[in-house]
């Protein structure tokens, strides 16, 4: 019989997220979610760029996987700024399509991951992948709408201020109305800041809330705001520990992946010689595939040299190397995703125990609900015990003479 897991019910439990993130079911879900996200972005951008609504090319999303973390951040920021800054209606529409699609993907994937993490941490139970996906499917709309509730709140108060500004277009009367009602605009501004900032901080608790409680989007939002506001110091401590430990774990995983890629290229290159060097140089012109944050800058000679592959077999080799390294790098990012969901689930349970005094092992179980439903008659009345059944079925036998 294996040793039971040590659960301390304090910030040290966050260190368990590293091992929890390596659950094959979570890694599969994270990998599938990233693949679906990249595919969704490529398809949407390709479609709308063909319609001339946007000028962004779909290869930017593939490069985000290939490049290192610091390269990813700069490329992503520059790409988003180039798309968002003009505020063209078509570009805003495309961004909205992308966001809603990604939210639907990660509502399903994130819901399943946090469900597995909740049962793993709270009750040390291993739920099968099919059950986790079934739970995420049932609660999909709750997962989907919970992050949107703060956005809707900010948008509502923003629209109120816009309407007030439209009234200000009326000559004389409108200016007087805006002058007298401007304090309400300031209050709306404060509410937008409050709802937006606290909602962004508590966003990490919304999926774990639904996975642990089996509740809806409103309960997820209320708990997210309550936990951040009730224990801000504890919340910040947990998040700081989570961030530092997560970065350290991701650095280790990224270093192992980088070293694996470099050793594979180096040892195969010893045997293959100049051919593999040409393939590496050709690929390096497109992206620095072996870089995971631990490589030096590309030399000027490598940047200026132009390498072309003449034979189809070398091009095939280059393409397959790209596919293999893309898969490895995607696995690194999938670990980051599964770690994030696992750690946030642990933090949710810790804060729930401190604020609501709820036992950590208290998790919503569908089996209990099904048993309660099965124990209830079709009319909604509880089934009586066996002795009561006899009294109801044979009321006229009481006091009757026994048969001779």
Report the location of each language-model feature.
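Membrane-embedded alpha-helical segments of small multi-pass membrane proteins
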Residues: 179-184
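Helix-coil boundary and N-terminal low-complexity module in membrane systems
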Residues: 1-178, 191, 196-205, 210-247, ...
């Amino acid at each position: 019989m294996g040793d039971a897991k040590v659960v301390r019910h304090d910030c040290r439990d966050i260190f368990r997220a590293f091992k929890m993130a390596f659950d094959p079911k979570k890694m599969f879900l994270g990998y599938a979610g990233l693949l679906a996200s990249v595919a969704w972005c490529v398809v949407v951008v390709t479609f709308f760029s063909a319609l001339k609504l946007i000028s962004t090319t779909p290869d930017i999303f593939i490069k985000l996987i290939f490049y290192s973390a610091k390269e990813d951040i700069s490329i992503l920021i520059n790409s988003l700024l180039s798309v968002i800054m003009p505020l063209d209606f078509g570009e805003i529409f495309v961004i909205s399509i992308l966001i809603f699609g990604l939210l639907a993907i990660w509502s399903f994937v994130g819901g399943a991951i946090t469900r597995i993490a909740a049962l793993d941490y709270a009750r040390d139970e291993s739920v099968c992948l099919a059950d986790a996906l079934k739970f995420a499917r049932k609660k999909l709309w709750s997962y989907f709408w919970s992050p949107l509730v703060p956005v809707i709140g900010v948008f509502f108060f923003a629209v109120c201020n816009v309407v007030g500004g439209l009234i200000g277009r009326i000559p004389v009367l409108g200016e007087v109305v805006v002058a007298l009602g401007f304090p309400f605009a300031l209050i709306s501004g404060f509410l937008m800041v409050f709802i937006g900032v606290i909602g962004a901080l508590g966003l990490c608790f919304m999926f774990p809330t639904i996975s642990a409680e089996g509740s809806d989007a409103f309960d997820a939002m209320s708990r997210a705001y309550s936990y951040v506001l009730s224990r801000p110091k504890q919340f910040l401590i947990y998040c700081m520990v989570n961030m530092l430990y997560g970065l350290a774990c991701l650095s280790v995983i990224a270093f192992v992946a980088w070293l694996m890629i470099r050793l594979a290229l180096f040892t195969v290159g010893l045997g293959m010689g100049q051919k593999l060097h040409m393939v590496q140089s050709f690929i390096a012109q497109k992206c620095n595939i072996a870089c995971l944050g631990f490589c030096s800058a590309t030399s000027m000679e490598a940047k200026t040299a132009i390498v072309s592959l003449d034979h189809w077999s070398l091009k095939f080799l280059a393409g397959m190397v790209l596919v293999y390294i893309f898969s490895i790098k995607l696995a690194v990012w999938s670990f980051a995703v599964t770690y994030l969901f696992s750690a946030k689930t642990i933090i949710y349970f810790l804060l729930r125990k401190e604020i609501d005094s709820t036992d950590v092992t208290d998790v919503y179980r569908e089996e209990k609900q099904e048993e309660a439903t099965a124990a209830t008659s079709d009319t909604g009345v509880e089934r009586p015990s066996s002795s009561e059944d006899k009294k109801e079925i044979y009321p006229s036998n009481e006091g009757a003479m026994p048969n001779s």
